[in-house]
Amino acid sequence: MGQKVNPIGFRVGVIRDWDSKWYADKKIVPALVKEDAVIRKFLNKKYNNAAVSHVEIERLKELKVKKRVKITLHSGKPGVVIGREAATMKETIASLEKLTKKEIVFNVVEVRKPEVVATLVAQSMAEQLENRASFRKSTKNCYAKSIKVRAKGIKTLSQRLGGREMARTEGYSEGQVPLHTLRADVEYATAEAQTTYGILGIKVWIYHGEILPGQSHEELRKERQSSASSNHGGGKRRPSRKGPRRSQEDAATEGGN
């Protein structure tokens, strides 16, 4: 049943660390959890065109947990986040301090290989589907880029293809994506494509290899982002067995869209 479990939460504490790092008295934990959610929602909404992969929040002892919050935003377009002469970033810090009533320490980290980040791949597919590209075409483009930049496996799923009234799930995979192996470094993300005929749900899994004892997930992530591109061939692309077989009429209709 590994395919029914969120791959990120399944590996937290084993090979992955938390995106929120802080300790607090149990009386204020609910307020801080809510504050984290508000901060992430604000940043994702403000920088929805800046290719934000994830947001890390820290309230460590040396930061004086009640008064200071350290936020690290990982983005594929750091220039959009910072702005000219850091004007956009200063505006963001002021808005966050007003929102949280706390001092904000704001850092921006560049994502150098967005092709192997599941969140950004899902966002890219959603944008292509919103521009009326076919699911197969957008999937093929993302697969080619991800496998070229050292991804060892990728899998995608989507629903309500072609605007049909009855939802049907169709997926493809290339390479290997082990879901049951805890030491397997698997990224997972979801995205929604707002189309003229409704919302399409997209799921993406990307496999980067195994993390062995003594290795750190964060160190390997930085190494992947800074390493040179090399071509790692994947397996044969195959359709998911979950979806029903498509007729020639369905294929022609979707190809026309």
Curated annotation (Swiss-Prot):
One of its GO terms (molecular function) is structural constituent of ribosome. It comes from the Bacteria. InterPro entries: KH_dom (IPR004087), KH_dom-like_a/b (IPR015946), KH_dom_type_2 (IPR004044), KH_sf_prok-type (IPR009019), Ribosomal_S3_C_sf (IPR036419), Ribosomal_uS3_bac-typ (IPR005704), Ribosomal_uS3_C (IPR001351), Ribosomal_uS3_CS (IPR018280). Pfam families: KH_2 (PF07650), Ribosomal_S3_C (PF00189). One of its GO terms (biological process) is translation. Residues 39-112 form the KH type-2 domain. The keyword Ribonucleoprotein applies. The keyword RNA-binding applies. Residues 234-245 have a biased composition (Basic residues). Keywords: Ribonucleoprotein, Ribosomal protein, RNA-binding, rRNA-binding. GO terms for cellular component: cytosolic small ribosomal subunit. Residues 217-257 are annotated as: Disordered. Belongs to the universal ribosomal protein uS3 family. Part of the 30S ribosomal subunit. Forms a tight complex with proteins S10 and S14. Binds the lower part of the 30S subunit head. Binds mRNA in the 70S ribosome, positioning it for translation. This is Small ribosomal subunit protein uS3.
